[in-house]
Each structure stands twice: as C-alpha cells, then as structure tokens.
Amino acid sequence: MGRSKSSSRWLNEHHSDVYVKKSKEDGFRSRASYKLIELDRQDKLLRPGMTVIDLGAAPGGWSQVVADVVGDQGKVVACDLLSMDSIAGVTFFQGDFTEDEMLDAILNEVNSRPVDLVISDMAPNMSGMKSVDIPKAMYLVELALDLACRVLKKNGCFVAKVFQGEGFDQILQESRGRFSSVNIRKPDASRARSREIYLVAKGFRG
C-alpha cells in the first residue's frame, strides 16, 4: 500500500528539517527540545533546583532540557500515553493523563512538594477534521491547566501547546484570571504550517 500524499510530505519535511538534524547532533530525542529552549530563552522559565511536571513527555525532548537545567537538586515528573526511555533525574509514568489513576500517580510523586512549572506538549491523535481535533486538544489543555492551578506554588509558571479555534479564547481568559502574565508564542522550531502555538503563563496568583 503506497504512502498518502500527506505522509510523504511529512517524511520529506522531516528529513530536510534543520531542527531534526540539529537534535541528532546535540543528542536530543526530538526537535521539540528547541521549542522549549526558545521559550525558556524568551520567558526565563527554567532554573536549577526547580520541581517540574512534564505532560505529554514522550519521546523526552522537553524532559531532557528540563532535567539538564534543574539538576540534581530539582525534580522532574513526566507522563505520556506512549513509552519513554529513561532519562536521568526524570520520574516517568506511562498512562492516560485524562484518567484519575494517572493524576493520582503524579500527585503522589510530587508529594506536596511545591511545583514551580507545569509544561504540556500534549496533543490528541489528529483526524484532520478541525471540528473534532480542536475540541479534543483544548480539553487536554484544560486538564493541564486544572493540574497547574492545583499544584503550582505562588508565582509558578504554566506552558501548554494550544491550537487556535473553539475553546481557545476561554482558555486564554481563564489563564489571565489565574496568572499575572500570559503570552502566546510561536517558536521558530514549530513547523510553519502547524496550527500549534504555545501559551506561556507566569506569576500564578495562587
């Protein structure tokens, strides 16, 4: 069975992608690492000793960046539906974040430790139908924001992949009510044709 036009286009883009090549050279597991590196450079999100929760972590590009910065005194708790090879300094749970069991596992691992940053690169399996995909994606953002508001320390930060469409304005308004600063970013490492953007919320009001 031949490849579809869309899958062939993705493969061509992937092989010619400067960030894919750079990730291999720098030892990162995915090009997504550079999205977080750029967001951190712009918004100063990471520092040594932080406690960070990474949602939608596999294959581990963001967790690698975070673990490298927070160091031995920090703590990184990650989860994903997909499996992920271990990363030094990262506690990983494989499972469905929309299920209470996974939420409980994350909360137990954090164990009342104040969380400095919640990051989410979660996205649903895309069908190509915006009317289906966008609500699913924004539901994941809503769950991630709920967790952030539950565990973040005062002045903590939240970063999430979002998609413009149904539910976006509501998430933006909700975030602005809970954080002192909310910005929308489109990192250079995000593919130009991708609808993904990143919500960066700083200064959790508690």
Swiss-Prot record:
Reaction(s) catalysed by this chain's protein: uridine(2552) in 23S rRNA + S-adenosyl-L-methionine = 2'-O-methyluridine(2552) in 23S rRNA + S-adenosyl-L-homocysteine + H(+)
GO molecular function: rRNA (uridine-2'-O-)-methyltransferase activity
GO cellular component: cytoplasm
Residues annotated as catalytic: K161 (proton acceptor)
Subcellular location: Cytoplasm
Pfam families cross-referenced by the UniProt entry: FtsJ
InterPro entries membership: RNA_methyltr_RlmE, RNA_MeTrfase_FtsJ_dom, rRNA-MeTfrase_E, SAM-dependent_MTases_sf
PANTHER family named among the record's database cross-references: RIBOSOMAL RNA METHYLTRANSFERASE, RRNA METHYLTRANSFERASE 2, MITOCHONDRIAL
Protein name as annotated: Ribosomal RNA large subunit methyltransferase E
Taxonomic source organism: Hahella chejuensis (strain KCTC 2396)
